[in-house]
Amino acid sequence: MGGSSSEKNISIKTGNAIIKALSTKYNSICPISISIDNDLSFLKQIKKGDIVFNALHGGSGENGDIQSILELNNIIYTGSNSKASKICMDKHVSKLVVQSEGITTPDWILYKNSKFSKQ
């Protein structure tokens, strides 16, 4: 929980809610507040646990960065894998993937590099 994005405070609230819910059933919960600033020291503590419950919001917590780090270190975690996280963070790409699977999605406009591209 925590992180370095503008959503840090909501991530802490989410983490605290998860801790409260899990503590009714599990005794050994170890909250870890992290900041992805090229500091991977949190990995030593995470590796001691059975599973990581990812409560990070925005930025590295949702864009696949933290998921990639956990995957590279063979750490089990909750939530989407790094590839799905990267795709979903880019709404244009996620809509293209959805369409490629035959799922209808409303038309959209992509604004990129000062130009409009209607899809």
Language-model regions: role of each:
Residues 1-83, 87-93, 100, 112-118:
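ATP-binding N-terminal substructure of ATP-dependent carboxylate-amine bond-forming enzymes
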Residues 97-105:
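Basic phosphate/pyrophosphate-binding loop/patch that engages nucleotide-derived ligands
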